[in-house]
Amino acid sequence: MASLMEVRDMLALQGRMEAKQLSARLRTPQPLIDAMLERMEAMGKVVRISETSEGCLSGSCKSCPEGKAACQQEWWALR
């Protein structure tokens, strides 16, 4: 199980990462990583970066089973 310091160190080494990448690299359940990142965001240590993918070739997000959530990526980086 990862600690807040290990999450911080991984972000420092990689620059920015998605929560699922952190979860896989640190071998920690994603709900725990999500909670740690939200806590670190509240402490002002990390920042959430939301990006909308422009690569949706069909432009039919309304009919996509995942909806627009599949086109939107959420990254985390140190502040």
Swiss-Prot record:
User: From which domain of life does this come?
Assistant: Bacteria
What range does the record give for the signal peptide?
A: none
Recorded hits in SUPFAM superfamilies, A to Z, give: Winged helix' DNA-binding domain
What's the short name of a Pfam family annotated to this entry?
A: FeoC
User: Which residues does the annotation say bind iron-sulfur cluster?
Assistant: 56, 61, 64, 71
Q: Keyword check for Repressor, yes or no.
A: yes
Q: Name one GO molecular function term.
A: iron-sulfur cluster binding
Its protein name is Probable [Fe-S]-dependent transcriptional repressor
| Keywords assigned by UniProt, alphabetized | DNA-binding, Iron, Iron-sulfur, Metal-binding, Repressor, Transcription, Transcription regulation
**What does this protein do, in the record's words?**
May function as a transcriptional regulator that controls feoABC expression.
- Give the protein family: Belongs to the FeoC family.
Q: Which organism is it from?
A: Klebsiella pneumoniae (strain 342)
Concerning InterPro entries, the annotation shows: FeoC (IPR023732), Tscrpt_reg_HTH_FeoC (IPR015102), WH-like_DNA-bd_sf (IPR036388), WH_DNA-bd_sf (IPR036390)
